[in-house]
C-alpha cells in the first residue's frame, strides 16, 4: 500500500460498552436467575464537573466506604454470594486494584470473576451455585 493512502477500515459490529454488557447481564439474570439479588457497586461511576469537583466527589464516596477496585456486581442468593467484574469484550483493561480485590475476595472463599459477556456471566453464576431457572438458548 502506498504511504499516502489511508489504511482500510475493518468492518463489523461495534464493540459494546461495559455499561451495555452489564445491562445485558442484568436482563439475562432477571430471566435465568430470578432468585438472585444483584446489586451494582458504583465504583466506576461517572463523576461530573471540574477536576476539583470530581476529586471531592471521589473523596466523599471513599469516605462513605467505597473500595477502589471492588467488583461491579454483587450477586446474593439463599446459600451463596458471588462477585462479577464486568468488562467489554475487547479493548478492556483490568486495573491492578481490581485484580487485587478479586484475589482478596477469592482468598476469603467467595466466587469472583471477570466476565465479558452474557454467556460468561451465566456460566459463572451457574458454576458458583446460583439457583438457575433457565439456560441460554444456543
Question: Where are the predicted features?
Answer:
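Catalytic phosphate/metal-binding cores of nucleic-acid and nucleotide-processing enzymes, i.e., regions
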Residues: 1-138
Amino acid at each position: 500500500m502506498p504511504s499516502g493512502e489511508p489504511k482500510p477500515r475493518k468492518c463489523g459490529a461495534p464493540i459494546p460498552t461495559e455499561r451495555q454488557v452489564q445491562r445485558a447481564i442484568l436482563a439475562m439474570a432477571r430471566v435465568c436467575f430470578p432468585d438472585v439479588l444483584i446489586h451494582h457497586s458504583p465504583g466506576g461511576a461517572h463523576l461530573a464537573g471540574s477536576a476539583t469537583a470530581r476529586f471531592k466527589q471521589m473523596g466523599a464516596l471513599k469516605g462513605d466506604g467505597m473500595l477502589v477496585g471492588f467488583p461491579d456486581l454483587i450477586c446474593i442468593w439463599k446459600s451463596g454470594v458471588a462477585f462479577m467484574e464486568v468488562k467489554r469484550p475487547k479493548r478492556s483493561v483490568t486495573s491492578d486494584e481490581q485484580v487485587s480485590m478479586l484475589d482478596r475476595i477469592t482468598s476469603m472463599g467467595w466466587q469472583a470473576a471477570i466476565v465479558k459477556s452474557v454467556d460468561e456471566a451465566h456460566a459463572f453464576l451457574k458454576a458458583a451455585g446460583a439457583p438457575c431457572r433457565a439456560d441460554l438458548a444456543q
